[in-house]
Design a protein with these regions (language model features):
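Membrane-active amphipathic alpha-helices enriched in small hydrophobic residues
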Residues: 9-26, 42-60, 108-129, 140-161, ...
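N-terminal ordered "arm"
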Residues: 4, 8-10, 30
């Protein structure tokens, strides 16, 4: 598979995984909590696979470009000998200036995809451990996972914006939306953990009656925030996948 194939396939795996995770959280929101964790695990696994494919693509792209240059250089060797030496030196200098920038961009894109993949893995581990026994440490893993996904998507936005002559705006918009969506989920997780810690410090006997009334509403509000973030991230992933698909080949 060529580098572009890796990127497009990875983007659609990521989009599909986000949609599956969002469906799992939606079903939990309407009361079907028993199906949430398996769907989230499947969804996050697909996202991780998609991000790995996208992380591999830049490496293949750089290697292919170098191979092409080497082949072209060999074929045109006799022609280049006839060209003016000064012109050759100027071209070489210009190419040497552009190459590090291109490789740096590829490196940032690769880093963003790798960070998102780590976030997916952290989410998977936290969810699996919570299925066995719900603990605060597992929630920290999920918060870390969502935060890493938000950071990784942001790095990919920065990478796209640096490619000034050829900015792919669909990918910029898609990754920006993913940054927001994953950030909302991380915020929800942090809020939940802080609320639990605060309630542990309060006197359970004094607060029991008040918490009984407000607990259900607060829980719904918190779940709704995470659910919105989940679907926002899924929409962003679909937009990014469309952007990758329609992106003109360089």
């Amino acid at each position: 598979m060529n580098p572009r194939g890796f990127e497009v396939t990875g983007a659609w795996f990521q989009a599909g995984g986000n949609i599956i995770s969002a469906i799992g959280n939606t079903r939990a929101f309407i009361g079907e909590e028993n199906v949430e964790d398996p769907l989230v695990i499947v969804g996050e696994s697909l996202q991780a696979l998609g991000n790995v494919l996208q992380a591999v693509a830049p490496e293949h792209s750089i290697n292919n470009e170098e191979d092409e240059k080497e082949t072209t250089g060999q074929l045109d060797e006799s022609v280049q000998e006839k060209e003016n030496k000064q012109s050759d030196d100027a071209k070489e200098q210009k190419e040497n200036n552009i190459k590090p920038m291109r490789e740096q961009g590829k490196s940032l894109e690769k880093t963003g995809a790798e960070v998102q993949a780590l976030g997916n893995i952290s989410d998977i581990i936290g969810t699996i451990l919570n299925m066995e026994k719900e603990q605060k440490e597992n929630d920290y893993l999920i918060i870390t996972g969502n935060s890493l996904q938000s950071l990784g998507a942001f790095l990919e936005v920065v990478d796209e914006l640096r490619d000034v002559p050829n900015i792919q705006w669909l990918e910029v918009i898609g990754n920006s939306i993913q940054t927001l969506g994953a950030g909302l989920q991380a915020f929800q997780g942090i809020y939940n953990v802080l609320k639990e810690e605060r309630m542990e410090k309060e006197n359970a006997d004094d607060q029991e009656a008040a918490n009984k009334k407000e607990g259900e509403k607060k829980e719904v509000d918190e779940q709704l925030l995470g659910l919105i973030g989940n679907w926002v991230q899924a929409i962003g992933a679909v937009i990014e996948a469309i952007g990758e698909t329609v992106e003109p080949q360089s």
